[in-house]
Amino acid sequence: MEKREVNKALYDLQRSAMVYSSNDTPPRWSTTMDADTRPTDSDADAIIDDVSREKSMREDHKSFDDVIPVKKIIYWKGVNPVTVINEYCQITRRDWSFRIESVGPSNSPTFYACVDIDGRVFDKADGKSKRDAKNNAAKLAVDKLLSYVIIRF
């Protein structure tokens, strides 16, 4: 199992209150349940199951009800959208990546990119270079993410 998969599973378990993490770097994980009420293997499999992840991706990203300080949102106004995604995922402890594909002839391809945050895939954007496609996809993802966050004053 890769580190990325383990992190996703741990943060999924944390959201469901089965484990908690320390503020150390890297975090230390502990269970929140007594020995007699520990979840079974089938409970953990249901959380990690890829099918449930696919279903959650179709929920229009409304599960991102994160609380972000207003200072961060003001700062993000003039920052590159890729930087915003990176900082957002650091604050919320989420994994993220780009999915990039190339279409067309090798001498003038069109690149398509989309942002994947914790298994939730955002809208696809195109560009003449990978960098342009990433920036365009990040802009779309930031617009959608910031429409669902809760601002803390």
From Swiss-Prot:
Pfam families tied to this protein: dsrm (PF00035), z-alpha (PF02295)
GO BP term, example: symbiont-mediated suppression of host cytoplasmic pattern recognition receptor signaling pathway via inhibition of IRF7 activity
GO molecular function term, any single one: RNA binding
Positions with biased composition (Polar residues): 22-34
Lyase is among the record's keywords: no
Keyword vocabulary terms for this entry: Host-virus interaction, Inhibition of host innate immune response by virus, Inhibition of host interferon signaling pathway by virus, Inhibition of host IRF3 by virus, Inhibition of host IRF7 by virus, Inhibition of host ISG15 by virus, Inhibition of host PKR by virus, Inhibition of host RLR pathway by virus, Interferon antiviral system evasion, Modulation of host cell apoptosis by virus, RNA-binding, Viral immunoevasion
Annotated region described as Disordered, given as residue ranges: 22-44
Source species, domain of life: Viruses
Residue span, Z-binding domain: 1-33
Domain DRBM: 80-147
UniProt-listed SUPFAM superfamilies: dsRNA-binding domain-like (SSF54768), Winged helix' DNA-binding domain (SSF46785)
SMART domains (UniProt xref): DSRM
UniProt keyword annotation of Manganese present: no
Sequence similarity: Belongs to the orthopoxvirus OPG065 family.
Function summary: RNA-binding protein that plays a role in the inhibition of multiple cellular antiviral responses activated by double-stranded RNA (dsRNA), such as inhibition of PKR activation, necroptosis, and IFN-mediated antiviral activities. Recognizes and binds Z-RNA structures via its Z-binding domain and dsRNA via its DRBM domain: RNA-binding activity is required to escape host ZBP1-dependent necroptosis. Mechanistically, the Z-binding domain binds Z-RNAs that are produced during vaccinia virus infection, thereby competing with Z-RNA detection by host ZBP1, suppressing ZBP1-dependent necroptosis.
Record remark on domains: The Z-binding domain recognizes and binds Z-RNA structures.
Quaternary structure and interacting proteins, as annotated: Interacts with host G1P2/ISG15. Interacts with host EIF2AK2/PKR. Interacts with host ZBP1.
Protein name as catalogued: RNA-binding protein OPG065
